[in-house]
């Protein structure tokens, strides 16, 4: 049995920043994550993906961001319980008790759920025999950008992942086709502007109004990606690689059975302190939903600060918390 001030579920960027915020208030944390390492999707799915909306970093790789967040949290000595899921929740008076899939038991007065998309996997396009090409020519995640150097690549999708990877891989690929069923992209406007600028150079060809239709190749080696528009017009794209980016399947797993207000794979929270319908349990980051929610890492950082400050009052039996700037707090620690 472990006793702690706060249990954090999820060790992605928002979970890691929550450790720091808790530490600044003198709160001890135990952290549960299903992956073997910290970092969440940033490490598991796209360690080399450039992130553009972190203050003071015009551009930073996901892996580097996680490294810095882990370093920032380290002085507060968090206890990580990795490669295990939070399974059972029990309430005993003012305390919560969580049991994990490895029978680890942790007790605290506050829980911060920063589980991102929960358990995740790719939404795969419904193409015949696509599994024959997976891992050889078809990839849903990128963890080694260099292996795509000099390739002809088809990227399918219209969101941030598709657009950002098209921009990034255009630096090393021979040719990129970006296939999207509409001419309008849902990525950040500045990213779309960069995409269209690069398209004018010919490094990226925008294949809009089309959807994936079939794959052609031998022994897992892709030769052609066939696309079709609404009028059944066919185009054959000469390609070595297909990168379908159609988002992730979300599964909250055991969290869905805890009595939380869950809608469409998200946890409903108030938009003041991000508390759920169960007092003492908070949800922040991509897993949380409230009116006006923006799914940004930056938003999750702000939610971490607000929720942990509110949790402090519960953890320390109503003790008032007086706000101080980080420079003052660090000065006191030294």
UniProtKB/Swiss-Prot annotation:
GO terms assigned for molecular function: ferredoxin-NADP+ reductase activity; flavin adenine dinucleotide binding; NADP binding
Stretch forming the signal peptide: none
Keyword set includes NADP: yes
Binding site for FAD: 33, 41, 46, 86, 120, 286, 327
Keyword vocabulary terms for this entry: FAD, Flavoprotein, NADP, Oxidoreductase
Matches recorded under InterPro entries: FAD/NAD-bd_sf (IPR036188), FAD/NAD-binding_dom (IPR023753), Fd--NADP_Rdtase_type_2 (IPR022890), Ferredoxin-NADP_redctase_2 (IPR050097)
Co-factor(s): FAD
The protein's assembly and partners: Homodimer.
Descriptive protein name: Ferredoxin--NADP reductase
Lineage, top ranks: Bacteria, Pseudomonadati, Pseudomonadota, Alphaproteobacteria, Rickettsiales
